[in-house]
Swiss-Prot record:
Annotated protein name in UniProt: Beta-lactamase CMY-10
Reaction(s) this enzyme catalyzes, per UniProt: a beta-lactam + H2O = a substituted beta-amino acid
Chain sites annotated for binding IMP: 88, 144, 174, 336, 338, 363
Binding site for AMP: 88, 174, 338
InterPro entries linked: Bact_CellWall_Synth/Modif, Beta-lactam-related, Beta-lactam/transpept-like, Beta-lactam_class-C_AS
Record lineage: Bacteria, Pseudomonadati, Pseudomonadota, Gammaproteobacteria, Enterobacterales
Originating species: Klebsiella aerogenes
Cellular compartments per GO CC: outer membrane-bounded periplasmic space
Subunit structure: Monomer.
Residues at which GMP binds: 88, 144, 174, 336, 338, 363
UniProt family annotation: Belongs to the class-C beta-lactamase family.
Modes of activity regulation: Inhibited by various nucleotides in vitro, including adenosine 5'-(P-acetyl)monophosphate (acAMP), inosine-5'-monophosphate (IMP) and guanosine-5'-monophosphate (GMP); IMP and GMP exhibit strongest competitive inhibition. Inhibited by the beta-lactamase-blocking agent, avibactam. Inhibited by clavulanic acid. Weakly inhibited by citric acid.
Pfam families, A to Z: Beta-lactamase
Amino acid sequence: MQQRQSILWGAVATLMWAGLAHAGEASPVDPLRPVVDASIQPLLKEHRIPGMAVAVLKDGKAHYFNYGVANRESGAGVSEQTLFEIGSVSKTLTATLGAYAVVKGAMQLDDKASRHAPWLKGSAFDSITMGELATYSAGGLPLQFPEEVDSSEKMRAYYRQWAPVYSPGSHRQYSNPSIGLFGHLAASSLKQPFAPLMEQTLLPGLGMHHTYVNVPKQAMASYAYGYSKEDKPIRVNPGMLADEAYGIKTSSADLLRFVKANIGGVDDKALQQAISLTHQGHYSVGGMTQGLGWESYAYPVTEQTLLAGNSAKVILEANPTAAPRESGSQVLFNKTGSTNGFGAYVAFVPARGIGIVMLANRNYPIEARIKAAHAILAQLAG
């Protein structure tokens, strides 16, 4: 009897040990975690960020690192499926949609904007191209619409009366009304409204099945709350051409799929050509070269150069344009994005096969995002 009990307990112990060993194998520590934690943990503390989803691409493999909460009230944790507002990172998808319209023959970047909107005939947009709208070089359109422009009728009236401050193409003035109009007219050239075209054609083609302009009821539980400077839960408000300029909500997993598509391509030939078109430089401002949506730098790139290209001077002021710089075979593409309650950053280097997505539910300084991402990418490239 005693021998049988010894055998039984031995068998149980063996099974328990095997189970523990198997559990250990199922969740090994990601070798990149110390690298990511070293940059992200101090960021969360310093800027009181409730939650952040970081996704990293290296050697074709996705790595996910999630921190904090998506909703302070419910305590729901952040995951790679949590939906964040990505603000102006949306512009890279709007640009891809516009490039897709070009590839499909619905429009050309050299087309005058009024060609695709009869209501613009006789305005300054008879002399401004679609490409200039896409690259913020229409001649000084402002960062935002004036507050009183709160309807489609007022929006059309605003564009019809607007007069350029600079010759089209001569200056970059970062502008939601500029790329917003580009996205609106690009969708019109394909005979569809922007949001359905984005959600039903472009996003599925990119494999982004958990990305939305308008978050549907069944996905609302995944939609994080942003937090204001006063720590109040907030989400983006509707606005004129908000969908086109800063309206996308997505997860770190989906946004990394977009990065992967920009690095390795997609099966859809037209969509692949569109992605390639967004990478082409139109002009340079300092060390930054402006593509469609994406902004690029010769790689390797210093932290200082990245900070300069994403500085308040570049974002808020008009800057003279120069011929696009020759960047060689290695290029870093990046884009920042913010809403009142969210802060995003995306960067990738196709030649190295590395990329990073950082999504937070607080709008924290762009400088801090750049420094953290640059440090992580440097380790990935090493």
